[in-house]
Amino acid sequence: MNNATPARACGIDFGTSNSTVGWLRPGEETLIALEDDKITLPSVVFFNIEERRPVYGRLALHEYLEGYEGRLMRSLKSLLGSKLIKHDTSVLGTAMPFKDLLGLFIGQLKSRAEAAAGREFEEVVLGRPVFFVDDDAAADQEAEDTLVEVARKIGFKEVSFQYLSLIHI
């Protein structure tokens, strides 16, 4: 890629509290607005029982705080490397694998970024901590493998990682 060509890949920082998506374009802001012209999306999903749908980010928090009946799920990143990732949770009366829950949220990041960019992204660079799980190399590798699996399932054909401590935006 030369400096006059937009990058083919997007970068996703899937955070415990908030997430961001970046796309390198000449002369443009790197971070993409994901919700209400804001570059962050709270890493939250609310399953609204009344309307039988998931909502994400600030809208999820709003509906929860307004008293809609449902289930709020936060800190989704903490599933990575945990034993829970191999299990299901009850969502809107059905069993949902935790991996699918991650896919819903990361898929939402992808679709919002694509809508804002006016193009599809088939390549992604995912930010990752130095260790998803301290002192457990197998769990750390499983966390990374899970992210690759989820990213491919939602449509990314190429997946790579960048340690977050090295990212400078």
What do the predicted segments below correspond to?
Residues 167-169:
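Conserved small/polar residues in nucleotide/adenosyl-binding loops
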Residues 27-157, 162-163:
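Phosphate-binding loop and its immediate beta->loop->alpha context
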Residues 2-4, 151-152:
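Short hydrophobic/aromatic segments of transmembrane alpha-helices and their interfaces
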Residues 3-31:
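Gly/Thr-rich phosphate-binding beta-strand-loop-beta motif of the actin/hexokinase/Hsp70
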